[in-house]
Amino acid sequence: QGTRLYRSRSFDKKPQILEFNDLTSAPYEYAKQNRMSPAGISMFYSSLQAKTNLAELGPTDGVIVTGRFTLKKDVRILDLTSLPSLSYWVKGDIGEMEFLRDFSKEVSRPIDQDDRIHIEYLPTQAFTEYIRYRFKDDNGAPLDGIMFNSSIPNAGKNVVLFCNKEESSEYVDLTDFKIYP
């Protein structure tokens, strides 16, 4: 609760009025495939720093609007950015930790941003669906999202929340936005 998240979107021209719904998760019919979700599945993709969004969005012919959101509640996140080192002396399942480390590398691998269907996304999308619907924490509660490193070197950390356009308002408030020419 209270953590700032940033989400960017490109527009053809500078918008006259901006509202929460303009910057939150895409509606199902416009949700494109992403690292964690196939086309038609809406999730809230964000980062911990505005510069991360700008780096990932890349150059555009129009303007970029970056919204600063604040988490309204505590969320349960699988953090793939700070996994412990593997050691045979540490208690736990080495196989599971090795899988998470490999998955973390895979999800942060650069993939061309175009309109093609990227089969490279299929493993990360399948794992995300498993985490979203089947995985529970020690208290039996589902996870709310995943944090992972940006595919852009040294750009920062991304957070995907498992909430669609309608559910976004339960998780975040839009506190501010900035327009980049």
Stretches with model-predicted labels:
Residues Q1-G2, R7-S37, T60-P181:
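Active-site and NAD+-binding cores of ADP-ribose-processing enzymes
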